[in-house]
Amino acid sequence: MSHPHDTGIQDLEAPVVLVVPADPSFVRLARLVVSSLAADLAFDFDEIEDLRIAADELVSAAIGAAEPFSPVRIQLTTGQGVLSLEASAATSTLGAELDPLAAQIVEALVASHDVSTAGGFITVKFRSHTPGSSQHLA
């Protein structure tokens, strides 16, 4: 039986890129894009919610550390059985990190995540194994 949202997408031919202002009201747009892509990749409902929450926490961290009015670039890619999110923005914050509770939440929801600041930018990332990959739900 096929997944109700299965569109046959296995790997994206090109990244999905979203650029939003450093304004917390745009976090919901990132969540929507992540949820939609995860559904197209045949993640189940609970996994989609996990990815949505992880995206919320990480994109919120990037927006929170970003310079006012600067763009936040969010890129989603797939390949080799992995869905990846990376968000980056200009920042003057050194050593940015997730709130400890947010870090625990994200750690429980995705295969790996990272928050770093270098060269005047904050970058947040997560990776999650896609349905059908050998590591999915491992």
Question: Where are the language model's segments positioned?
Answer:
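Bergerat-fold GHKL ATPase/HATPase_c domain
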Residues: M1-I53
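Conserved beta-strand-loop-beta-strand hairpin that lines the nucleotide-binding pocket
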Residues: M1-V17, A61-A138
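Conserved ATP-binding N-box helix of the HATPase_c
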Residues: F45-F69
